[in-house]
């Protein structure tokens, strides 16, 4: 189920130019990744705050917690840094997250640029440590 479902989502994203989450909704919202992650983490006994933060990193609500803000920002920045399913996957920073963090779009662009300058070195260092 999951491999075929995942491929259907990627195909839909590519055809429609939408996000992974939007593709999940458009294809019936069966087993969306927020719900699946929440269920897996509940079984892992990682704590309620982390379960809820991961389970709401796209549906952040009006007053997201600090952890939700961190996860949401990291998720969107990872797309900006080239770690998305598709090269042109839309980036959707939640206004509530940016507001709570006191960030403007230009701040996010600056953060992305600083991260992209150092990221290759960080990845190389990590790979040296784990190998």
Question: Which ranges hold each PLM region?
Answer:
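Metal-dependent nucleotide-binding catalytic modules
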Residues: 1-131
